[in-house]
């Protein structure tokens, strides 16, 4: 029973083991899942077992062992092998023995698989032990191999280190060798370069020559940078010799090419035109003087670039470049100097006597020559502007040498001014400013020539001012005032009258009507132009010295520098004022003082108006020495003779040096203010003479009465005779009311008779209503004031009411009405002339019209009008700009001027 239970329990255990083994490899939820690598190892072991031989027992996996299979095998085997003995069982003992044998056999058969598995395990154990022994042996051999590897590695590392050291040493030695070879290269090229430079086949324009120059420069620079090397000085000399040979080759080549071009230009072949014939044709001249050189420029340019690229870093190349340029310019000078000289001589012959055309043509020719020469020069070289400028200045000096003898003998200011304009405007401002680099030399010579012309112009202007202004002797026609103005005014009036209209002879002729319309329009246009200026303002009616002064200043203004013009204008205006004053004196002596003064006022106004457009300051600073203190210091020195050598602070000589120093004084002379001062003086004199002419008897009476009253007035106002002093004038026979009445009547008669003449003269000379009103206002006020003084004098000196009635002394209002009525009568008397003047005058100032309106309103007032100052009158007098010629248009008038020849040269 125990065996059966034991067997059952074993079977049960086997069943559990089988179930667990099945769960280990279950596809759904395995207890011990094998990885892919483990399965591969298992397959490898299986294959090894299969390959080991048929004697080896087949492996039995736990999954193949089970109780059902074991029992089935045991049953089948027990059915076959376990049999009863043939004799049978005789007794119980035999049965028990048999049963024991059967049980042992069953038990043995039941454990057969386990025994086989145990054998396999033992076999595997033996194999593993054997494998472990092999692994141990392999590990021993591997350890030995590692030891040997470490030994070899140490040896190899040492060998590698030694090899690297040797390689580094080899590289260092190679670098040292290369460095030595590189440095020796700069010393070993001397012979090779000498051989190349001495080769007869070497061409300067070839690439081999360029390489030679590069090597020479490289070696020279290296040796100069390392002067401490052995034999550096000797090799420097050798390379310098090579450079000298190369420079000689370049110099010979370039000079040969340039000389050939020069020879071909100066001595052309028979089929080429000669120089004299070529100068007459510009294209032929250009081909002759520039064709050969332009052909040679291509050969020289490449070689010149070799030198120019090195000239900035080497003085030898710079000197060689300068020599080549000097040779080129010398050859060009030998070609162009005679040609330029001949051309200028031809121009001089062609424009003989016409200095302006000669200057313009000669300068234009030199401008083209300078531009062509500059263009040709830069076809050969890229640098060298200073040498080119010197060469071009030499060519332009021919122009200067040709023109200067003419300039220093020109006497006419017009010619000198025109030459100045040509040089300054046409040449310097137009041509030179457009191309300043090419025309630098021409600008220098033109500026020198301009300075000579300006110097001559200033000199001739001084002589002109002295001869034609200061020493001007006017003729009777120059002083025929106011006859000249009256004649011109009559001509203006005759032109003002419109011609009677007439019908055309043929109404059907369109040509005749059109031509008549055109003719009428042209006549109207001419008449309009002629009536723009009044007779007194016409340029031809100016006094010759005024006209000449303004013409001279207008020419000098555009020709000379501003400081020079200021000095000349100061002198010219001063002489012009003196000349006008002298002419006014002669007119006053021949005609009346009024004519002379109006003549001077008009021309001073013209002079002031014409110098206004000049944008210069007419102020000139004059410096002088004041020696007034020198005399005082000298007297002090003589009085202190004993203190001449005194060692103290009272040394007489020291005081003389300190106190006797001349003082420098500066005086500012303003020509504009000088004109204003002269105008003020003349206006004052004219106002005085006009008042004297209109109310002369009244002024004489007032002066005589004032003198009498001044003599009879006591020294002290408290004197008892002071009350009788007021009757002294009344008791004088010449101051009786009847005499005063006759004086007043005579004065009124003079006003009525001469006021029209006075205003007529003002209108004739001044030709400007505003100016006439401004000048007439103080005359009017002085006349009114004279009558007011007379009335005050009669009132305060014992004249009774009956005496006042007898004298018929008018009041200020009555005098104003009298002057206004006389002015109206005068205006009616000269209505035609005033209308002509108003139509001839083109414009008037707003300020002047305002003043005129004030004067008209003033005439209706009975109050005494304050007398305006003469300075205000002179400041208010203005000439309408449209009535006078501007300085720019003065030269356009055809004015005949007489110029005397000066012998000061």
Swiss-Prot record:
Domain of life (superkingdom): Eukaryota
Location in or out of the cell: Golgi apparatus membrane
GO cellular component: cis-Golgi network; Golgi membrane; Golgi transport complex
This protein's UniProt keywords: Golgi apparatus, Membrane, Phosphoprotein, Protein transport, Transport
Annotated membrane topology: Peripheral membrane protein
Modified residues (Phosphoserine): 841, 845, 856, 859, 862
Keyword NAD recorded: no
One GO biological process term: intra-Golgi vesicle-mediated transport
Purpose of the protein: Involved in ER-Golgi transport.
Protein name listed in UniProt: Conserved oligomeric Golgi complex subunit 3
Gene symbol of the encoding locus: Cog3
């Amino acid at each position: 029973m125990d065996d059966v239970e034991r067997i059952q329990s074993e079977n049960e255990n086997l069943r559990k083991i089988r179930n667990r083994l099945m769960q280990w490899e279950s596809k759904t939820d395995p207890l011990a899942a094998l990885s892919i690598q483990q399965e591969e190892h298992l397959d490898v072991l299986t294959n090894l077992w299969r390959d080991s031989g048929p004697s080896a027992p087949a492996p039995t996996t736990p999954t193949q062992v089970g109780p059902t299979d074991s029992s089935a095998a045991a049953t089948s085997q027990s059915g076959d092998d376990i049999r009863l003995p043939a004799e049978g069982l005789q007794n119980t003992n035999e049965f028990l023995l048999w049963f024991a044998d059967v049980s042992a056999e069953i038990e043995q058969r039941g454990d057969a698989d386990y025994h086989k598995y145990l054998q396999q395990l033992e076999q595997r154990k033996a194999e593993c032990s054997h494998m472990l022994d092999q692994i141990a042996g392999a590990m021993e051999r591997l350890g030995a191999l590692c030891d040997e590897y470490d030994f070899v590695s140490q040896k190899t590392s040492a060998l590698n280190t030694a090899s690297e050291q040797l390689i580094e040493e080899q590289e260092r030695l190679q670098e040292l060798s290369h460095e030595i070879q590189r440095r020796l290269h700069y010393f070993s090229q001397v012979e090779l370069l000498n051989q190349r430079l001495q080769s007869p086949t070497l061409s300067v324009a070839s690439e081999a020559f360029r390489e030679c120059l590069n090597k020479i420069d490289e070696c020279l620079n290296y040796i100069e940078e390392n002067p401490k090397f052995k034999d550096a000085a000797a090799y420097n000399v050798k390379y310098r010799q090579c450079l000298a040979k190369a420079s000689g080759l370049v110099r010979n080549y370039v000079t040969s090419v340039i000389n050939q071009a020069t020879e071909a230009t100066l001595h052309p072949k028979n089929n080429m035109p000669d120089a004299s014939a070529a100068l007459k044709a510009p294209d032929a001249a250009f081909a002759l003087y520039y064709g050969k050189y332009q052909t040679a420029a291509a050969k020289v340019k490449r070689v010149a670039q070799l030198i120019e690229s090195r000239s900035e870093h080497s003085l030898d190349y710079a000197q060689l470049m300068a020599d080549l340029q000097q040779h080129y310019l010398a050859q060009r000078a030998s070609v162009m100097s005679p040609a330029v000289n001949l051309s200028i001589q031809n121009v001089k012959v062609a424009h003989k006597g016409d200095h302006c055309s000669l200057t313009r043509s000669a300068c234009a020719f030199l401008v083209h020559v300078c531009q062509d020469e500059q263009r040709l020069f830069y076809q050969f070289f890229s640098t060298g502007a200073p040498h080119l400028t010197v060469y071009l200045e030499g060519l332009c000096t021919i122009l200067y040498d040709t023109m200067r003898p003419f300039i220093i003998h020109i006497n006419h200011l017009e010619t000198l001014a025109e030459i100045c304009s040509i040089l300054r405007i046409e040449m310097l401002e137009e041509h030179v400013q457009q191309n300043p680099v090419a025309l630098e030399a021409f600008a220098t010579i033109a500026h020198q020539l301009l300075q000579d012309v300006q110097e001559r112009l200033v000199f001739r202007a001084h002589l002109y001012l002295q001869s034609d202004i200061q020493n001007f002797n006017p003729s009777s026609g120059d002083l025929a005032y106011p006859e000249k103005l009256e004649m011109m005014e009559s001509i203006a009036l005759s032109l003002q009258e419109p011609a009677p209209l007439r019908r055309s002879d043929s109404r059907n002729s369109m040509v005749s009507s059109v031509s008549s319309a055109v003719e009428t329009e042209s006549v109207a246009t001419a008449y309009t132009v002629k009536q723009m200026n009044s007779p007194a303002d016409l340029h031809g009616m100016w006094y010759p010295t005024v006209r000449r002064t303004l013409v001279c200043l207008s020419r000098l203004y555009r020709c000379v520098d501003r400081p020079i013009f200021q000095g000349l204008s100061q002198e010219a205006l001063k002489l012009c004022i003196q000349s006008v004053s002298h002419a006014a004196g002669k007119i006053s002596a021949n005609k009346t003082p009024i004519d002379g003064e109006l003549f001077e006022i008009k021309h001073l106004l013209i002079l002031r108006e014409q110098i206004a457009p000049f944008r210069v300051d007419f102020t000139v600073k004059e410096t002088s020495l004041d020696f007034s203190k020198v005399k005082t210091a000298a007297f002090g020195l003589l009085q202190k003779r004993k203190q001449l050598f005194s060692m103290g602070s009272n040394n007489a000589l020291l005081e003389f040096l300190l106190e006797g120093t001349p003082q420098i004084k500066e005086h500012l002379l303003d020509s504009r203010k000088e004109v204003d001062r002269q105008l003020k003086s003349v206006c004052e004199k004219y106002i005085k003479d006009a008042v004297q002419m209109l109310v002369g008897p009244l002024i004489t009476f007032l002066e005589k009465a004032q003198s009498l009253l001044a003599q009879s007035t006591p020294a002290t106002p408290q004197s008892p005779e002071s009350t009788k002093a007021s009757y002294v004038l009344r008791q004088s026979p010449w101051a009786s009311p009847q005499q005063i009445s006759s004086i007043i009547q005579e004065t009124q008669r003079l006003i009525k008779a001469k006021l029209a003449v006075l205003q007529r003269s003002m209108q004739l000379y001044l030709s400007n209503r505003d100016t006439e009103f401004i000048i007439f206002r103080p005359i009017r006020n002085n006349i009114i004031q004279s009558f007011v003084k007379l009335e005050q004098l009669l009132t305060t000196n014992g004249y009774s009411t009956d005496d006042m009635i007898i004298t018929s002394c008018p009041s200020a209002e009555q005098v104003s009405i009298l002057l206004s009525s006389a002015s109206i009568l005068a205006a009616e008397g000269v209505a035609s002339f005033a209308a002509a003047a108003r139509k001839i005058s083109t414009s008037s100032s707003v300020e002047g019209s305002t003043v005129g309106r004030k004067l008209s309103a003033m005439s209706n007032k009975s109050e005494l009008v304050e007398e305006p100052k003469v300075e205000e009158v002179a400041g208010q007098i203005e000439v309408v700009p449209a009535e006078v010629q501007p300085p720019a248009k003065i030269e356009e008038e055809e004015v005949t001027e007489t110029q005397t020849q000066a012998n000061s040269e």
